[in-house]
Amino acid sequence: MSFSVLAVVGPTASGKSDLGISIAKAIGNAEIINADAMQLYKGMDIGTAKLGEESRQGIPHHLIDIVAPDQELTAVEYSKLAHDAIRQVLERGNTPILVGGSMFYVAAALDELDFAPTDEVVRERLESESEELGALALHERLKSLDSESAERIPAQNIRRVIRALEVIELTGEKHKSALPEPNYLRPTLQLGIEVDREVLKNRIRQRVEKMWAVGLLEEVQRFLELGVNFSRTAAVAIGYAQARSQLLGELSQQEAIDQTVSLTNRYARRQMSWFRRDTRIRWLDSEANLEKQALEQIRLGR
């Protein structure tokens, strides 16, 4: 299969960003498009492991720092931006490389998706109910209506719980059924990074501890001083709520770090569960040379 779009996916802390840059440098004339939902937000740098300009090694990056943390950017809006970015890279004669682990955003960028309907009145009512009854009550409601979605969506991610309930109410169908069988919008080669679970746990612990060491608290403190009210999407960024709780004296530093590690491990498991269902992905072994494996798959794909 000849492809026009490359993608590098996998769980958090698996090395996607570095591999994306290595591939871009090796094949030449390539540009990276971000598919990490939290790296879209300006100023959310340390907690999202966002690469700085120097670390990007001169490779053009798109869809990073495009919206303020107090603004909402839906998956539908991201889809349009990603499709435009991919088209523009191709028009320049370059290869777009989508890099990220935000599952639905990857699908929104690569696949033909018929997005489920939305209704502002229904959504606002569900949001009011979540404030009145609590996130757990809405998650229990979702479990009674669509147990598979409830298993995939954690109760603390109230934005996705509300979205699933909204789709069910508007369509009468389970949220999962709103996603069709995957079909690439353009010919795509999707590479996934497979990491041993214990190795990944260690990497996640090291990454989180480094975030605290290099200034996550100061980053969150600046947001607090500016009075920034995080949007629903930005508010679910793992690490930011924990750092805020530490600054407010609600958690010790060790408790904040441990909670962030635990939530990140849980998120990584959900990522792998999602990506493993996509039989189109060609998996790379993180214990071997990732760049060499990726370039071999690219050679075969061409």
What is the predicted function of each stretch?
Residues 1-302:
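Phosphate/pyrophosphate-binding catalytic cores of soluble transferases and nucleic-acid-acting enzymes
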